[in-house]
Amino acid sequence: IALPSFLNQANKAKQSEAKQYLASINKGQQAYYAEKSAFIESVDNIAKLGLGIKTGTSNYTYDLGESDVDGKDGVHAWTKGSGNGLKPYAGLVYLVEADGALTSETALCEAEDVAADPTDIAAPTVTGTAADVRNCSTVAGYTIAL
């Protein structure tokens, strides 16, 4: 009876890795954009963010891609592959206009369910307005805002 509870706690600990990695990537993307006016859109260039993180661990494999929110540039990072029983996650950084200037916002989204094929999780499809993205309501496959 205690084994399912233990496994659930173990998966929560593993999933916290994804949340921490994606939050770090989001912050790194914001800093990079502030300095270079561009985002890193390929996992091959993730070292340019200066985070010192790997693109894969025993729990998750991470990837990057470009997004468009309200017709403005953005980027997303997601857990492309995961261990069995682990939920997929996506982090997004996107530009919004505030007081006549562009600024960046972030979102961290969780999938409702464990992926059917944890070795090949599709990139999040991002549509809608910044407000929609902020609460993950238009990030296909990811519905829970963290």
Q: Predicted segments — roles?
A:
Residues 1-34:
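Amphipathic alpha-helical segments typified by the pilin-like N-terminal helix
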